[in-house]
Swiss-Prot record:
Name of the protein in its database record: Glycerol-3-phosphate dehydrogenase [NAD(P)+]
Name of the gene: gpsA
Highest taxon listed in the record's lineage: Bacteria
GO-annotated biological processes: carbohydrate metabolic process; glycerol-3-phosphate biosynthetic process; glycerol-3-phosphate catabolic process; glycerophospholipid metabolic process; phospholipid biosynthetic process
Binding site for sn-glycerol 3-phosphate: K113, G141, T143, K196, D249, S259, R260, N261
Binding site for NADPH: S23, W24, R43, K44, K113, A145, R260, E286
Pfam families cross-referenced by the UniProt entry: NAD_Gly3P_dh_C, NAD_Gly3P_dh_N
Chief localisation class: cytoplasm
Keyword annotations of the record: Cytoplasm, Lipid biosynthesis, Lipid metabolism, NAD, NADP, Nucleotide-binding, Oxidoreductase, Phospholipid biosynthesis, Phospholipid metabolism
UniProt KW Cytoplasm keyword: yes
Xref: SUPFAM superfamilies: 6-phosphogluconate dehydrogenase C-terminal domain-like, NAD(P)-binding Rossmann-fold domains
InterPro entries: 6-PGluconate_DH-like_C_sf, 6PGD_dom2, G3P_DH_NAD-dep, G3P_DH_NAD-dep_C, G3P_DH_NAD-dep_N, NAD(P)-bd_dom_sf
GO molecular function: glycerol-3-phosphate dehydrogenase [NAD(P)+] activity; NAD binding
Top enzyme category: oxidoreductase
Length: 340
């Protein structure tokens, strides 16, 4: 007889493990600590000690007191008793970390936004490549880590194919200031977070080059059209792309200098090259890595993404004026599928 799996409930996920002690991982650990035990894993010993002894993360969230109930560690084995793992590792380091954890049945909730440069895989595709039989979820939406950690109101998409796991994780992570909305569209939730990183750079360029509010609105709306085309080509649902993890995240990161991608783009628009910025930046700007691989995957899918292509040109050193001229001289067309 087949063995019936136990239906998952919020109590089943009492102990949450968080991979990544950067700003986002630390903020998520603070959320998860509201209803249960949390073990937070990171690489830097000095950060681990600061969290455990002084209850701060001096490198990433220096002004925020971290709940005392969070236990930080630099040993992956300390996560062995956790019943679910939130993964907040930068996209380009995701594979190397996932390969170090056991291949078991504990759900992985992917919280990073991006596309692996070498493979062209979204985070959920990458995780499924390593763990083909493991439950995979995506948590994504309009979130600045500092605001989540300060318990300002936040809503996110939590996507998983397994209904009971999705429902249990929502109950476990929901707190008065952090509200997950359910989705079964894992790819759709993943696409939005990856593409918006690149489009946020574009909006930053508009701000830095002082191209005006009209141009920023055009980038957001036409950028969303590119996100929509790309997502649908990968099998995403349009309703997911218009939700928190797609349009919601796009609007947030295209409108604030709290976004690292927006700030990077603003500096590009002001005339600072990619190389000049890299010398000064200690944190990951995921959109820089995502842009060229996103363009490559889009070309393979025959999806037109002119704004993404423009950002690739700017990162490679082309001037804002030349890239803008190319964008505005493209053949006139209908806004959607209507012919001119």
């Amino acid at each position: 007889m087949p063995v019936l799996e136990e239906k998952k409930t919020a109590d089943h996920f009492h102990h949450i493990g968080v991979l990544g002690a950067g700003s986002w991982g630390t903020a998520l650990a603070a959320v998860a600590s509201y209803k249960g035990a949390v073990t937070l894993w990171g690489r830097k010993r000095e950060i681990i000690d600061a969290i455990n002894q002084r209850h701060i993360n001096p490198d990433y969230l220096p002004d925020i007191i971290i709940p005392r109930t969070i236990h930080a560690t630099d040993e992956l084995n300390d996560l062995s008793s956790a019943s679910a793992l939130l993964v907040a590792i930068p996209a380009q380091k995701m594979r190397s970390v996932l390969r170090q954890i056991p291949n078991d049945s504990r759900p992985l909730i992917l919280c990073a936004k991006g596309i692996e440069a070498e493979s062209g895989l979204l985070m959920s595709q990458l995780a499924a490549d390593i763990f083909p039989h493991r439950p995979i979820a995506v948590l994504s939406g309009p979130t600045f880590a500092s605001e989540v950690a300060r318990h300002l109101p936040t809503a996110v998409t939590l996507a998983a194919k397994e209904k009971d796991i999705r429902a249990a994780l929502m109950q476990r992570l929901a707190i008065p200031t952090f509200r997950p909305y359910a989705s079964s569209d894992v790819i759709g939730a993943d696409v939005g977070g990856a593409v918006k990183n690149v489009l946020a750079i574009a909006c930053g360029v508009v701000a830095g080059a002082k191209l005006g509010n009209n141009a920023r609105a055009a980038v957001i709306s036409r950028g969303f059209a590119e996100m929509n085309r790309f997502g649908i080509a990968l099998g995403a649902k349009e309703e997911t792309l218009t939700g928190l993890s797609g349009l919601g995240d796009l609007v947030l990161t295209c409108s604030s200098e709290l976004s690292r991608n927006f700030t990077f783009g603003k500096k590009l628009g002001e005339g600072y090259s990619y190389e000049e910025q890299q010398k000064k930046r200690a944190v990951t700007t995921e959109g820089v890595f995502t842009a060229p691989v996103l363009q490559r995957v889009a070309n393979k899918l025959k999806v037109e993404m002119p704004l993404v292509s423009a950002i690739c040109d700017l990162i490679e050193g082309k001037s804002v004026n030349s890239v803008l001229e190319r964008l505005l001289s493209r053949p006139l067309k209908g806004e959607y599928s209507i012919s001119v």
